[in-house]
Amino acid sequence: MGDMNTTGVSAIGIANIAMDGTVLDTWYPHPELSTDDAHQWRDIGEPGTVRLGAHDLSPRMLSLVRLDEDRMVEQVAVRTTIADLSQPPIDAHDVYLRLHLLSHRLVRPHELNMEGVYQKLTTVVWTNKGPCLPDNFEFVRTSLRSRGLIHVYGIDHLPRMVDYVVPTGVRIAEAERVRLGAYLASGTEVLREGFVSYNAGTLGPATVEGCLYSGVTVGEGAVLQHDSSVVSNALSNGDRPALHVGASTVLGVNSTLMEVSLGDNCLLGPNLLIEPDTTLYFADDDRLAPATTIAGEDGWSIVHEPGNVEPVARKVANTTSTGSSGQSNQGSRSSRRAKAEPTTTEAKEPRTKKTRARKTTKRTRR
């Protein structure tokens, strides 16, 4: 990921504004990053959002400007200008433009400031007839029934990405599982149980059958198997720090990675929860250490092994993801364990709590 983007952006969009002035959403079909030409900013105007008249719009955009009395919403044309994407958003229009930039793949996650996003947005009823306020929705539903059956997709701050942006070269099995503001590189597959939040996503072709929460990115060839999760915990202001899972890294079924980054070519075995203070057993040099010891490093396998209380971490070379099963990784680990078996008649003791206690006592006596 690159540094914060200081480029500006300007775009024309259609906003749904409730009768009380609440901005429900804004759709920007063709956002463009600015150049450094000074005259461009003079033509665009001051940062912020302004309403546009008929002379500022194409016939197609003008046809979308209307008063929807059934929804009690006005659809208005606006132009939103952001002078510097490294500065925090100032209102809901600003937030929606930034979300569009991410889903259009014009900027990557964490290359623009998303501070206080939820504080700028309101809770919305997302329907097949358009966004509505939740407070008067049952009254609105009665009016909308004359236009056919009403489908409510959700009641939340953020909508589905595909209702605003459909990036090329991706597969999304369930539209509800990808939010506007997700960054999906071409070649990405989000399977039925996958989920990608805003300001998160894939930086290369990847397979997502787990959850990528806000603030999380994964590299090319990464595989999140069923029910796996990568979580960047929210700060006091609601923002989530950057967390990255490297290229060709596999997260096993029902595994969770919280506040710890992994590098390239790693394997996190099934049914594991790894947090910063999770104790790992490093088998190569027979020691215990927290998971932060290897945060962001390449080529680690972390799995459950019989006879060990802690997850076992081993340094592996040339680890590659061969699909969602990860069977080749399991086979290579078995081969390495076989080579490491003692050649004497004395069997190696399993690492139980009592074993570690005896070893600690011996070291103390010396």
What feature does the model see in each segment?
Residues 26, 99, 172, 176-178, ...:
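Generic structural hydrophobic/aromatic packing signal, biased to beta-strands
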Residues 211-220, 224-346, 351-354, 358-366:
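Glycine-rich hexapeptide-repeat left-handed beta-helix
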Residues 141-192, 196-197, 202-203:
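Glycine-rich adenosyl-nucleotide cofactor-binding module
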Residues 1-163, 293-366:
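Terminal amphipathic alpha-helical/low-complexity segments used for targeting or macromolecular assembly
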